[in-house]
């Protein structure tokens, strides 16, 4: 049964959190509108379509993205207010233990964690699919290719190579297509450039050289133009990592498996996205533990000092997240470990602060 204390803390927790969430989202929408005003005036989409397809899904995405940090600020704010009004001291003096005070906090954190997990795995992919489709239709390109020396295994034994690729013109430079059988090269097509025809789905190669090996014999063919159909699209060479956010769990796993089979080495953002969908919601428990442990102590600086400490910890947490993501991308750190390191480190910090909290 919920006691008056439990209902009071849960009401304060949720009320403060949703107030901060609504305020931050209103500010974010205003800033985004001011930034994209020129884009909106150029596009043919109606105001209703912009609101329905873009901003409603924009709010869903960023509300969930910042939920952990906003929960932390909410806990700091209302717990600091309770401490400033000596309500925490009154609870402890009346015989209520500090772990008992923590119970409604963690009950609320469990509700918010479950909600975030549900949104991450069931709601957000569909919302992001609509939002990103709107952005790609009206604001930005669907994909981009920044890498050099692109290598893709189209089918077993069939390998395509581009030295560089121009996404605006769908043209690849220094193109080659190799066919291997039993460890031996049987056919190799090289060309100065290859342009993709989106209508026919074929690649048109220019100034090509085709070598065909038949045992000890080699046939060479040169030409100015040749159309060849291969199971490769420009979007397979480079896709915005944000597209991973629009994929459901099954779709994301299938995409990762297919790209690994092609030898695509740019999958780390997709792997990080996959594991973060589960790891990030659990940061709610960590933020709640740290927030209560810091803000429950009545200090001379009051709420201002608690907020300053909270902002500092948030910045360190974000820095740790970025650091581990970079380590996963560039240093070979396992992405599953990388996304959980910030939670584990800050959980240890939270336990230490909790032990120092007044009881």
Residue spans for each PLM region:
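Short beta-strand/turn micro-motifs at beta-sheet edges
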Residues: 226-228
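Transmembrane alpha-helices
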Residues: 1-156, 167, 184, 214-216, ...
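An exposed, glycine/acidic-rich loop-and-rim segment of catalytic or binding clefts
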Residues: 219
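Short solvent-exposed strand/turn elements
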Residues: 207-215
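Structural signature for solvent-exposed beta-strand/loop edge elements and short helix-capping sites
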Residues: 154-200, 205-208
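N-terminal amphipathic/hydrophobic interface segments
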Residues: 191, 222-224
